[in-house]
């Protein structure tokens, strides 16, 4: 039972790291989209 519990803890820890990594990636994608939007807007008004 304890071994299984330890396995579950490890899996949850890895999942947490994956979620943080995914969140960081999404944040970077959003920044890129914002920059592209600003560029497109600047091109539109010039």
Swiss-Prot record:
Source superkingdom: Bacteria
Signal peptide: none
InterPro entries assigned to the protein according to its UniProt record, in alphabetical order: DegQ (IPR012554)
GO biological process, one term: positive regulation of single-species biofilm formation
A Pfam family this chain is assigned to: DegQ
Record-stated family: Belongs to the DegQ family.
NCBIfam families: reg_protDegQ_Bacil
Role: Stimulates the phosphotransfer from phospho-DegS to DegU. Affects protease and levansucrose production.
Protein name: Degradation enzyme regulation protein DegQ
The organism of origin for this protein: Bacillus subtilis (strain 168)
Gene: degQ
């Amino acid at each position: 039972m304890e071994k299984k519990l330890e396995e579950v803890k490890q899996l949850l820890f890895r999942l947490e790291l994956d979620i943080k990594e995914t969140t960081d990636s999404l944040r970077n994608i959003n920044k890129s989209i914002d920059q592209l939007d600003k560029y497109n807007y600047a091109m539109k008004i010039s």
